[in-house]
Swiss-Prot record:
Gene3D superfamilies, per the entry: 3.90.1200.10, Phosphorylase Kinase, domain 1
Catalyses which reaction(s): L-homoserine + ATP = O-phospho-L-homoserine + ADP + H(+)
Species of the source: Rhodopseudomonas palustris (strain TIE-1)
Keywords, in A-Z order: Amino-acid biosynthesis, ATP-binding, Kinase, Nucleotide-binding, Threonine biosynthesis, Transferase
Encoding gene, per UniProt annotation: thrB
Listed name of the protein: Homoserine kinase
Entries under InterPro entries matching the protein: Aminoglycoside_PTrfase (IPR002575), Homoserine_kinase_II (IPR005280), Kinase-like_dom_sf (IPR011009), Pseudomonas-type_ThrB (IPR050249)
Pfam families according to UniProt: APH
């Protein structure tokens, strides 16, 4: 979450008058994240989150995100629920941006994920995948392999400002992943596509909620697992933690076993996931709006993760032996 668009107090008061959520007591911008402008609202009826969707998010996609949250919540997944205004609408406009109010979830995200946290997110991800099977709406993944070339084009001219040689490193990896190696015949379904630690809340050792479905889409289920391996299983010194990976994968496969093809493809999917976040971080790093209340994330973190994944020989390198499982 982040703040790119500020909101005047009188404009916010007029906006909130359309909702039955009590009187506004205070509000503040939330600086974490990189995609949209988010505010914590404190009203006489509790806490809510106000999101203003910025330009990277297409307005036509917003009904998908909002309906998905409702579907998952109805299916027993702890996630925010959209709040409708007095006319039953969950999507509105504020400060020239599409806007929505969602319920507030208790819990905190883990700044230093433990093995227990990794097991929790593995289980939660699998349950979300299963709950999404009967969600009728569809949305293609605009940031899968076909979407990486435009990101590279947007950043290549200045990539070497971040690290000398970065442009050529990215070009080589992108060419490889575009060469026909990317799988298309693995089990597909609804994926979160951005399940980083700051998008999972815990109370103690238990997952209390999954947030931020801005990138949710239909794609390879194992790709979502690969994203989590990169996001949860590396230490602050960039070393891969096999114990965390084993916990995450074991918890996931207890709920939804990976078939043999998914297992074989996981290292390649993790390479692609690393490149995808490296590219979006690089574009954001080079294009932070002046004065924005935002903390751009370091693209070099994902250079190191990509280099690791390039050298993974198979799923055993993630600490597990689950060959023969069936979906």
């Amino acid at each position: 979450m982040a703040v790119y668009t500020d909101v005047a107090a009188d404009e916010l008061a007029d906006f909130l008058s359309r909702y039955d959520i009590g009187d506004l007591l205070s509000y503040k911008g939330i600086a974490e994240g990189v995609e949209n402008s988010n505010f914590l609202l404190h009203t006489s009826r509790g806490y809510f989150i106000l999101t203003l969707y910025e330009k990277r998010v297409a307005r036509d996609d917003l009904p998908f995100f909002l309906s998905l949250m409702t579907h998952l919540a109805d299916s027993g997944i702890n996630c925010p629920q959209p709040v409708a205004d007095r006319e039953g609408r969950t999507l509105a406009t504020l400060a020239g941006r599409p806007a929505a109010i969602i319920s507030f979830l208790d819990g905190v995200w883990p700044r230093k994920p433990s093995v227990v946290h990794c097991a929790g997110v593995g289980q939660a991800l699998a349950k979300m995948h299963l709950a999404g099977r009967d969600f009728a709406m569809k949305r293609a993944n605009a940031l899968s392999v076909a979407g990486w070339r435009p990101l590279f084009a947007a950043a290549e001219a200045r990539a070497d400002e971040v690290q000398p040689g970065l442009r050529d490193f990215l070009a080589a990896e992108l060419s490889y992943l575009e060469s026909g190696v990317w799988p298309s015949d693995l089990p597909q379904g609804l994926i979160h596509a951005d399940l980083f630690p700051d998008n999972v809340f815990f109370i103690g050792d238990d997952v209390s909620g999954i947030i931020d479905f801005t990138f949710a889409c239909n794609d390879l289920l194992a790709y979502d697992v690969a994203i989590c391996l990169n996001a949860w299983c590396f230490e602050a010194d960039h070393a891969f933690n096999v114990t965390k990976a084993r916990a995450l994968l074991s918890a996931y496969t207890r709920e939804r076993p990976l078939d043999a093809a998914e297992q074989a493809a996981l290292p390649l999917l993790a390479r692609g996931a690393a490149l995808r976040f490296l590219l979006t971080r690089l574009v954001d790093w080079l294009n932070v709006p002046e004065g924005a209340l935002v903390k751009p994330k370091d693209p070099m973190e994902y250079v190191r993760k990509l280099r690791f994944q390039q050298n993974v020989a198979g799923i055993r390198d993630y600490g597990v032996e689950i060959a023969g499982a069936v979906a």
